[in-house]
Structure formats: C-alpha cells, structure tokens
Amino acid sequence: MPCLSRELSARNGVMDQSLMQQTVIVVPARLASARFPSKLLAKVSGTPLILWTAMRIAREAPEFPLWFAVDSEEIGDVLEKAGFSIILTSSDLSSGTDRIAAANETIGAKRLINVQADEPLVTRSQILALTEAIEKPEADMSTLATPIVSSDDFKDSNVVKVVRDANGFAMYFSRAPIPYPRDDLEMLEKKTLPLLRHLGIYGYTAEFLRAFTILPQGDLEKVEKLEQLRALEHGYRIAVGLTDDSSIGVDTPEDLARVAPMLLAADKGVG
C-alpha cells in the first residue's frame, strides 16, 4: 500500500529532503475582500493577519522557500519589513491560482504549494501531505480532505465535499452531500461512510499551472462555483491527501475574533 504509507509519512512530519529542494510555498495575498475589507491587514494583538499566517508557515515548514504573491504595495510592505519575500502581481488576476502562476514566472519552481493567506493555523502535517500528494507521478494538482464528523456539515452547502477513487484521486467535488446514502440515511449518524470535507489548499506542478491559466471555465465550475472542477472537467488529475487537521479560515470579522485566541495561545506555546 505505497499510497497509504506516503500519506502516513506526511502526517508524521517525515519527507524526502529532495522533494523539499524542488518545492516552494507561495501564498497569494489579495487586499480586496467582499465580506471583510482589507482583512489581511486586520490586527490581532497588534499584528496583521497576513503576518500571523507568514510566521505560522515559517515555523511549521522552515525547510521550504516561502514567497508571497501580493497585489498591493501595502501588503507587500508589511511582509518585507518583517523579512518575508514578495512578488508584486497584477490586481486584475482572477484567482489565487492565476496569481501563483504569475509569481512562478519569476520563481521558476518545479512544484508549488498554495497556502491561503487567511488561514493562519495551517499545520506542518497539512503542508507535507500536500507535497507528498503532488509527488504522485500521475498528479497534476493536489489538495487535502479531512473526515466529516457532523451530519450538519455533510448537508451544508458551504462545506465542500470530495469523493476519492481507490488510488486517492478526486472523482468529484460538490457542495451537495456526496456520496449520498440512498437506502440508509442513518449511515450519516453511524459514520460508516467515507465522508470527506475538502480543504481549500493546493499543490501544483509548474506544467499544470501554465496550462490551467488558459483553460476556459467549464459548466461544472460555473454551477458549483468551485475552481478545482475546471481541472477535472479538462481531464487533469487531482491527488487528494488525507489529514486529521481541520482548516480554519478567516472570511469575516467574526471569524477573526474566533481565531484570535487560538493564535495567541499557539504563539505563547512557542515562546
């Protein structure tokens, strides 16, 4: 079971050093935000959110080169003053994937890990699981999933579900409940189904990134509003790694208030 052993090695924080030398972490950082204007500059204990994310990544995965693909000098200045590397990209780019592709024209990495700028609690095991998954020979892209433990989450359209094939590759992503237990709805409560919640962090090969930026949107992406479906619709393969670590993003001021105590506790633990 080589796939399982690779997933377990990533969870345990062990990885081939040669993979690290060819892989970089790039964080797309966009100033505008519909639900929380300038959220990356919002402060927790005097420190902007983007710096909490930057410090977390640097602490959790110091082996990897770390870049920030920014669309504003304001965010760039904050990061540079703290000693982080930035690449200024166009504010007209439509997605984080496009922003990373633009940044890689300068970086020139073979594989890239996309950590969201508004997820300041990303873990080492998540980063390593993404890196292990993108190393699969058939993988064009990688992402993560974690078990769904609540029937409410399974039914929630804001919780994106993913179904994997026997080799750990994505079959489909949906906001709908999948796979749906037609004959026994109690299976939801019994937790006997392999229900997986998609976590929106990704790994890419450089070749895939170059191709993805010129692919047209497909009908599935337009209907579900899920960018990763563009890759599946055009025949690309997405390796889905497993992690026990859930993802906590900041989309609203309320999210930031909820995350703030966790950030401070984690920072105190390191100190």
Question: Where are the predicted features?
Answer:
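Short phosphate-binding loop-to-helix
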Residues: 67, 73-132
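A conserved hydrophobic position in a structured secondary element of the catalytic/binding core
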Residues: 70-71, 122, 204, 251
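Short, high-confidence coil segments that cap the C-terminus of an alpha-helix
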Residues: 63, 109, 138-140, 236
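Conserved alpha/beta core of the MobA/IspD/sugar-nucleotide pyrophosphorylase nucleotidyltransferase superfamily
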Residues: 189-271
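N-terminal glycine-rich phosphate-binding loop and ensuing alpha1 helix
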Residues: 19-70
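Hydrophobic/aromatic residues located in beta-strands of well-ordered beta-sheets
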Residues: 25, 66-68, 112, 142, ...
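Conserved core of the sugar-phosphate nucleotidyltransferase
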Residues: 123-215
